[in-house]
Amino acid sequence: MVHPVKLGRNVRMSYSKIDEVIDMPNLIEIQKNSYEQFLKEGFKEVFKDVNPITDYTGNLILEFVDYSLDEPPKYSVDECKERDATYAAPLKVKVRLINKETGEVKEQEIFMGDFPLMTETGTFIINGAERVIVSQLVRSPGIYYAMKIDKAGKQLFSNTVIPNRGAWLEYETDSNDVLSVRIDRTRKLPLTVLVRALGYGTDLEITELFGEDERILATIQKDSTKTEEEGLLEIYKRLRPGEPPTVESAKALLHGLFFDPKRYDLAKPGRFKFNKKLSIAARIHGFIAGENIKDPDTGEIIVAEGETISREKAETIQNAGVNTVILRVDGKNVKVIGNDMVDIKRYVDFDPKEIGINEKVKRDVLMEILEEYKGKGDDAIKKALQERIDDLIPKHITKEDIISSISYIIGLSYGIGSTDDIDHLGNRRLRSVGELLQNQFRIGLSRMERVVRERMTIQDLDVVTPQALINIRPVAAAIKEFFGSSQLSQFMDQTNPLAELTHKRRLSALGPGGLSRERAGFEVRDVHHSHYGRMCPIETPEGPNIGLIGSLSTYARVNEYGFIETPYRKVSKEEPGKVTNEIVYLTADEEDEYIIAQANEPLDEEGRFISNKVVCRYKEEFIEVDPSKIDFMDVSPKQIVSVATSMIPFLENDDANRALMGANMQRQAVPLIKTESPIVGTGIEYRAARDSGVVILAKNPGVVEKVTANEIIIRTKDGKRDTYKLLKYMRSNQGTCINQRPIVKKGEEVEAGDVIADGPSTDNGEIALGKNVLVGFMTWEGYNYEDAILISERLVKDDVFTSIHIEEYEAEARDTKLGPEDITREIPNVSEDALKDLNSEGIIRIGAEVRAGDILVGKVTPKGETELTAEERLLRAIFGEKAREVRDTSLRVPHGESGIVVDVKIFTRENGDELAPGVNKLVRVYVAQKRKISVGDKMAGRHGNKGVISRILPVEDMPFLPDGTPLDIVLNPLGVPSRMNIGQVLEVHLGYAAKALGWKVATPVFDGATEEDIVQTLRKAGLAEDGKSILYDGRTGEPFENRVTVGYMYMLKLAHLVDDKIHARSTGPYSLVTQQPLGGKAQFGGQRFGEMEVWALEAYGAAYTLQEILTVKSDDVVGRVKTYEAIVKGENVPEPGIPECFKVLIKELQSLCLDVKVYSEEQEEIAIKESVEDDLEELNVNIEGREDEVNFNEFNDIGEEITDEDLEVEDFDLQDLNDDDINPDDTIDAELDDNLFDDDFDDTFDDDDL
């Protein structure tokens, strides 16, 4: 029954029935562990891969000895955000240069660039912006077998050998039973050609190797080569057509393709998958032995002929070093060949993990070492094993692997082995931050290696130093490029704490080396049975990326090979049917071998299954089994879903499509001024807030000594003082407000890990994305048609859904060719009234209220001028630069924006701030707005029930309860049945009862309150059991006809606010080529009157309207200015002229070499002006709202050298790239020429009226 649960500082009444035996892991460990692993091991591995670099003669040897990243970063995290710097520490590498001729050894420590560090919360600060590296789901290296059925109904098998890097090998069978191979995506060859090239030259050797199989015989027949040499030459001809083939070069080519660790790399996961797939044990168990199987060392028979091989015996066979087994299948003997790898534990007495071996090793190498060091003690063996670890666990493919993989494809047609499913999570792995960085670092180092080699040949051998050989630029560039512009390095979604957390746990199948949106079919995107407990089946974007981007499940973790594991409770083998508290993490392919019970299966006190038959999962099926057959049990019902999904109460009663929207919309909830945790929660809110990193946690236990809005001081047990600084009104990446508030009092005792301050969207340490409001499900005068929402004015008056949004504006004073720009209060042609809030330097004061068009930073730019005469130059020289012409390029508040200036930051060269080249001063102004909820804003519940506010009713008109309480929100009941998200109705019922009892409740997903529980809680609260109530119409006081479902629902205000979307324009910028208005709010564009709209006007015969829209309101350059003047002066609108698109058409025809002339009705030729500028000069009126056409070469003359810094990727903004004539340095200015202003024009035509 319902019981209290303590979550942090809060107590919730929980309806859960299952005791969870394991705590949830830290939710951002996927980021942190991966990065730490990279710092510890990744660097070493990469350096080991490039070591040593030798010159072409082998005389100079350069090796990387050691590295350090210990120095503290130059700036703290907060300073980096403020200064647009990267949070990074210097990477120093110790390099040794050995000259073999002279025996001279030089060592030097070399700085290899700044390496970005991860913050406490799992993010990176790159150029001042907080970014997240998303983990990538890719196909694991390994061997994959597939089957297709041809027209005759025959099974054809094929396989692909995929390395981490290197050439692919693909085998296939055709309908004539001929086996062929493609090497590195070239044309097909008979497979026996490859086998011959590997050293099995004659037909006899091949048939002895694989047995007398019809496929092998058919292939031999088709194969034109007959010896090893011929095989090698045949392969060489295929791969290097046009070069003279020799046996030597062919051998070298084959070796370079597959057996050179520098060019062919399986990586750890690849070797692991190879051994798993090709191991003889996995292939023979369950089959009948065709001959006696003997231990090669002792000669004893492990399995006798005709005996069925058990799993245990199969393991024994493999570890005894038996590599070939004859099986009897349907009366035929079939030969199965393994890849000769054994478990080292059977051969040595110590634990091989001590020396870093935890996979199978190559038998022949192991035997060689053990023979050599027999009787010399364990330490000698350990040392020898460590020295030859690359031979024991080869990183490249081996000859045995290739032979074994061919044996596998032959065995498949006898039913030995199995084909693979590429979408199974056992065959897909994660590349997390660490590995992605390691790959990038490797690319940088290999580019550097080339440079080092070249320099070794050029430089004087006697005086050469490591520093002179090494150029760190390629390394620094590779890292910078990865963080700045990789598809997987993303600008952090910081709308609210849940958005941050989810972003760090995201799994993407896109990105370099992954899939592309266009190529991904349905299968890849589908939910797969192996996703259970690893990847959330609910949370994924709607749209083109659906199914390609997922989210890690709550309990999942990533193992050392990059496969996702999920925890299970072990069922005791000694007492079948009894569940222990031992936790085992399984990967997807391990899980496929076991039968697993659900977490909500009832157990008795001792942990035994109560039912005689238990519904379980086995692979992709649900089966009913006896309790004694069960191997594992789920640890928690919420282990299958992600964090965001597990925050939806009554998820089990919602349709999956709507739950998907609910999970995604929680990430878009805007932080409100006053937060309030949900009455109906799921109990995960506390953990999510704690791990998201927005709340402050006490580092050490102690007593609170001082609390202010800005800092908390805690005196620890050993008398030290810990000071915690709080963030106040900072701007997030998405423009929402980050603000922390203390929740402890002076004198309070705290433990380490306790929440001591709330962040945005958290309440008392729990995530609080919205508000609990009283809703009723009823229609009201059609105002909630089509999911619209009717709200009470109380939500506006009491600031229930009010949020703060902070916008950042920046102005920089640069050096131009005509002289430096100046930030100043002296601006030409600006009234004193417009300058009233600027200080003496021309920068707005903090606290000033600003509207659209107000000046934030006064700035003037020198104007271009004609060549001066000698006299003028002399006067200039005598009287200084005062007479210079300047134009106003001040930073103004853009159209439609307003607010209060909350902060101003000034960076100058004089103060030692690092600025971009050519910038002398940078000013950042932060403007905050309080946005109350308004008509047009989007709101949503947690069940995918979203809508737009259609009307705000006065409180007195809202329907009210019998005790006089008015509703806050009226929702449409028709939004529930067809969408099948019944969870919202249950939430409302439970919220109604819980509010009446003064409870906050937790109803965990798949383990929450049942209908019975809700009815009982309603009864306990003294409310009607159906959760309905009589409502009275606020306007008349009459009761409504039927009783209405009312209760408390948790509603979110989403980031789609109407203020950011509404937009109007009378005149503004035009596109350069077509002279039509630009489009979109960002460009201050117009509304497109498209083809279909034109048809509508044509259909009505509205000729004049149509003419106007196609000419003066669009691209008739002269006509639109004349029309504008006519409106201002109150005259009649003139006749339209020739639209620009007509001129463009003529130009297009002329470009096809057609001589086109234009004639009037009187047969007179009309001169078409060549360029718009000719027209504009005659008109001398500018309605575009900017001073003059943008000059692209203003700051970068062809003569100037463009430096790397100018091309910084970060500086690009997509909106700047949208149109060719928008220059990011030019603020679009909607001011009109002064001489045009007329008082009544100003009154009648106002932006607010639009």
Curated annotation (Swiss-Prot):
Function: DNA-dependent RNA polymerase catalyzes the transcription of DNA into RNA using the four ribonucleoside triphosphates as substrates.
Alphabetical list of PROSITE patterns matching this protein: RNA_POL_BETA
HAMAP family assigned to the protein according to its UniProt record, in alphabetical order: RNApol_bact_RpoB (MF_01321)
GO MF terms, alphabetically ordered: DNA binding; DNA-directed RNA polymerase activity; ribonucleoside binding
Record's protein name: DNA-directed RNA polymerase subunit beta
Annotated family: Belongs to the RNA polymerase beta chain family.
Enzyme class: transferase
Quaternary assembly: The RNAP catalytic core consists of 2 alpha, 1 beta, 1 beta' and 1 omega subunit. When a sigma factor is associated with the core the holoenzyme is formed, which can initiate transcription.
Catalytic activity: RNA(n) + a ribonucleoside 5'-triphosphate = RNA(n+1) + diphosphate
Statement: the UniProt record of this protein carries the keyword Repressor: no
Signal peptide (from-to): none
Span list, region Disordered: 1215-1250
GO biological process annotation, one example: DNA-templated transcription
Stored InterPro entries: DNA-dir_RNA_pol_bsu_ext_1_sf, DNA-dir_RNA_pol_bsu_external_1, DNA-dir_RNA_pol_su2, DNA-dir_RNAP_su2_dom, DNA-dir_RNAP_su2_hyb_sf, RNA_pol_bsu_bac, RNA_pol_bsu_CS, RNA_pol_bsu_protrusion
E.C. number: 2.7.7.6
Pfam families reported in the protein's UniProt record: RNA_pol_Rpb2_1, RNA_pol_Rpb2_2, RNA_pol_Rpb2_3, RNA_pol_Rpb2_45, RNA_pol_Rpb2_6, RNA_pol_Rpb2_7
Keyword line: DNA-directed RNA polymerase, Nucleotidyltransferase, Transcription, Transferase
One GO term describing the cellular component: DNA-directed RNA polymerase complex
UniProt keyword Repeat, yes or no: no
